[in-house]
Amino acid sequence: MSLFDHSVSELHKKLNNKEISVTDLVEESYKRIADVEDNVKAFLTLDEENARAKAKELDAKIGAEDNGLLFGMPIGVKDNIVTNGLRTTCASKILANFDPIYDATVVQKLKAADTITIGKLNMDEFAMGSSNENSGFYATKNPWNLDYVPGGSSGGSAAAVAAGEVLFSLGSDTGGSIRQPAAYCGVVGLKPTYGRVSRYGLVAFASSLDQIGPITRTVEDNAYLLQAISGIDRMDATSANVEVGNYLAGLTGDVKGLRIAVPKEYLGEGVGEEARESVLAALKVLEGMGATWEEVSLPHSKYALATYYLLSSSEASANLSRFDGVRYGVRSDNVNNLLDLYKNTRSEGFGDEVKRRIMLGTFALSSGYYDAYYKKAQQVRTLIKNDFENVFANYDVIIGPTTPTPAFKVGEKVDDPMTMYANDILTIPVNLAGVPAISVPCGFGANNMPLGLQIIGKHFDEATIYRVAHAFEQATDYHTKKASL
């Protein structure tokens, strides 16, 4: 039995009782990485020397009264979150040798909580992708079956947790990039409310949509991690000055009287029968615990996919203009003048999907097309947000599938961008509305790959979706299933 089969609270108790050491936890992580990483390929960079040194330092503090619950816990960090002195590439060759000179706010907070960073996790390049096949280095595989994708863009973050390489990880979610891989890998992933967690130090893809969040084995562990990284940050102008409550207090298993909305659009055309049936089964479980549910409509959700790709690509075209070979990152050697420097550096450094989205965004923002595309997409985004607000006026949470289907095979959709984009059709509306949502395991498809239940909450009401997710988790055994890698 792995130490990582225990929860954070159980491991914390074992540490305080000196049944285990922090070094034991770190070595457990690196041993597992040595055993499975050649197949899973979840990590881009390991930080073994510093992690082991930090473990020895913390071993001397075991039993101290001020040790928090995350003391000594091993964590993986998605490679678009900057880490001081530890290579951060965004899985792009244009940043292949980039060593940041500061820590992201979330990394600072986790260091203050005495967690130990095991390494940086693989992803789709600049977080643009749904399968991890767009990494500029190598594709991560799904621990449940290495022939399948782990999802994206936080595929490495989800796969590392599912494979038992780390206890938990950080990912980022722009259109489903935490929740979709969490669903595909059978783990728990939360996208917080926009502004709940600081984005300072997150390499920007689409600044109005990006959000950092936790990926864990259980809902309780997820709540511990969000508790540690939440809160206002003066370094992030979009960080919200909203009180962070006690997320653990509501994990009672009680959902009696809870009002659940189920959008008909989330169970209709384009959603596979397996995903639909798993959600209906989950609703029966919650109904048996005293919750009620009704079908509702989010009428503008059918425009979410087009709206998202116009807005996110437009923001990406602006954000990624900084990677020009002048200030940092890889610089092309094939240069005769300044124009060559810009063109050749970006042509050689960016992958095909990143180039595709930059071109789409540049077109949408260009003179003559701005009003027809970007401005119109912003107007539709407002309508989508209003749809959520209208539903939340009468209901506590919204529930549906996280993804239309279980994970698909490696290479199955890589040459068909539109089919690939459609994998996020159920997660994208949440980012456009800025509300929080969590994915928890809720079953398996005919291919024996996990399915995820998506629970969506009101702005800054992560506590309620944790309450529902935890109640469902404890009433079922899906969270106890492990990839047999």
From Swiss-Prot:
It catalyses: L-glutamyl-tRNA(Gln) + L-glutamine + ATP + H2O = L-glutaminyl-tRNA(Gln) + L-glutamate + ADP + phosphate + H(+). One of its GO terms (cellular component) is glutamyl-tRNA(Gln) amidotransferase complex. The active site is at K78, S153, S177. Its EC number is 6.3.5.7. Pfam families: Amidase. Keywords: ATP-binding, Ligase, Nucleotide-binding, Protein biosynthesis. The keyword Ligase applies. GO terms for biological process: translation. GO terms for molecular function: ATP binding; glutaminyl-tRNA synthase (glutamine-hydrolyzing) activity. InterPro entries: Amidase (IPR000120), Amidase_CS (IPR020556), Amidase_dom (IPR023631), AS_sf (IPR036928), GatA (IPR004412). Belongs to the amidase family. GatA subfamily. HAMAP family: GatA. Allows the formation of correctly charged Gln-tRNA(Gln) through the transamidation of misacylated Glu-tRNA(Gln) in organisms which lack glutaminyl-tRNA synthetase. The reaction takes place in the presence of glutamine and ATP through an activated gamma-phospho-Glu-tRNA(Gln). Heterotrimer of A, B and C subunits. This is Glutamyl-tRNA(Gln) amidotransferase subunit A. It comes from Bacillus cereus (strain ATCC 14579 / DSM 31 / CCUG 7414 / JCM 2152 / NBRC 15305 / NCIMB 9373 / NCTC 2599 / NRRL B-3711). The gene is gatA.
